[in-house]
Amino acid sequence: LPIWLSRCLESICSQTYQELEIIVLNDGSTDDSLAICEQFRAKDPRLVVVDKENEGVSRTRNAGLALAQGDYIQFADSDDVLDPDYTQNLVQAALQHSADLVIAPYWMVIPSNSSKTGHALETLQESLGIEPEAPKTEVHKYGFLPQGVYSREDYARRLMQQPASFYYGVLWNKLYRREIIAENQLGFAPDVHWAEDLLFNMGYLEHAEVFVSIPDAGYHYIQNPKSICHTQIDLRGIVENKTQVFQLFKEVYTRLGLYEELQPQD
């Protein structure tokens, strides 16, 4: 993902919040990704570049967590882009409210060629020697939790209103307290190939106490048809993981004393 990666790293290095430890993990890529990472490291000493064999997203994230030394953890995918003040807004909210988790709305960016139809049209135009038209991009903002400070129980109740949403499920629109992750040995299960972000977040939910929602979207999630989540699909694994997710929801909400209150009614 050389083109996407350069744009992503540039947006991270350009954050107005400067006290960053930027851990970049190259999970056995065979393109120019490692060279691009090294170019950025040469310009910015905050970068820690790790070149490792291909082990998958969960083991790669665990390697990053093991290296991290800051007070807070923030995730980013190499396809995506951060607004300059995104990290500043997250950290400011965390410090102001002594938050264990900060969550923000995000922008979903859908290039026209990210759909099957758009990609097929672009391929046809190229085969006919026709210059493809500039992609018409769709942008949508997503966020469900009103601005404010929430207890664990209130956050859990809100989550169950949109349990399948990216907003609650993904990593990259949140800021996590590293101490909670380390003390409770939280991480990503290598054998899980669907909703691994959500499983991590459910584990984190049990140990965090103060949750803060901010109103400003600063993360641009860009749908890329060539990304790992679109090209490496294990349908059997997904079915098995869905069963795990449903069971985990029940177990977590039972331990929180909320299962009877929130379980579906006949």
Locations of the language-model features?
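Short, well-formed alpha-helical segments that are part of the catalytic scaffolds
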Residues: 1-14
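Cell-envelope/extracellular polymer assembly enzymes that use nucleotide-activated donors
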Residues: 11, 21, 199
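Conserved short acidic donor-positioning loop in nucleotide-sugar-dependent glycosyltransferases
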Residues: 12, 27-28, 55, 78
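A conserved acidic beta->alpha catalytic loop
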Residues: 26-35
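Glycine-rich, basic loop-to-helix element that forms the pyrophosphate-binding segment
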Residues: 52-68
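Short aromatic/hydrophobic "clamp" motif used to bind/position activated sugar donors
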Residues: 73
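Donor-binding/catalytic cores of nucleotide-activated saccharide
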Residues: 81-214, 219-237
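C-terminal, non-catalytic tails of nucleotide-sugar-dependent glycosyltransferases
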Residues: 240-265
